[in-house]
Amino acid sequence: MPLKLVPSKPEEVPLMVETYFEAFSQDPIHQRFAPRGTQSARDFWTTSLSAEIRDENNHFLSVWDDSSTPETFVGFAKWIVPGASPEALPPADQWPSEGDQQFSVFFFGRLGEMHHEAMGKRPHWYLELVAVKPQYQGKGAASLMLKYGVNKADEDKVECFLDASPAGQPIYERYGFRVVQRDTFLDGTYVQCAMVRDARV
């Protein structure tokens, strides 16, 4: 399948938002904080991505299937460059109102703690988000976006970091990531992993 990796453009944000909802429609965490089909969740992601894609510290990537006419948007990823900090988490009342705002603050705050505990102040490339449409999952789109970041990290001779559910672990492990920390959520039914890829020096 001919997939094409390109830098994302601001005008692709609506496609990115829809892809996010499709990719995470079965994920209980994402459905709890940003329920699919709700206007507040759509507005939250549209506003967030529209701002973040204009920040030069964020490398947004898009994958397209150019075998179709017109081309089909397949997925996107966000890598954050070494030395840059992720955007500050919003207060509870700025998370999607139709989701669980207090849980959102708790969950994403905990992910931030795990990130800091794993990496401290060491420079690294951070894969903050990757989303691929369900019909394209397992067909190489995520690998294209992963390769971009790990190649950048190898050029810079620094580590990579990401957090993942167990479902995502196998592909990340193929690219040299290893689990350094785990935490459980939703009464122990959901496991989130902090994963690190060592620097290639």
Regions found by a protein language model. Give the residues of each.
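Conserved GNAT-fold acetyl-CoA-binding loop/helix
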Residues: 26-47
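C-terminal "cap" of GNAT-fold acetyltransferases
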Residues: 162-169, 185-201
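Conserved acetyl-CoA-binding loop-helix of GNAT-fold acetyltransferases
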Residues: 132, 138-151
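Conserved active-site alpha-helix within GNAT-family acetyltransferase domains
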Residues: 143, 155-157, 166-183, 188
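Conserved acyl-donor/pantetheine-binding loop and adjacent beta-alpha core of acyl/acetyltransferases
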Residues: 70-137, 186-190
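A short helix-loop-beta-strand connector motif used in the catalytic cores of GNAT acetyltransferases and
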Residues: 43-62, 84, 122-126, 190
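Conserved GNAT acetyl-CoA-binding A-motif
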Residues: 123-126, 152-164
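A short beta-loop-alpha structural element at the N-terminal edge
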Residues: 4-18
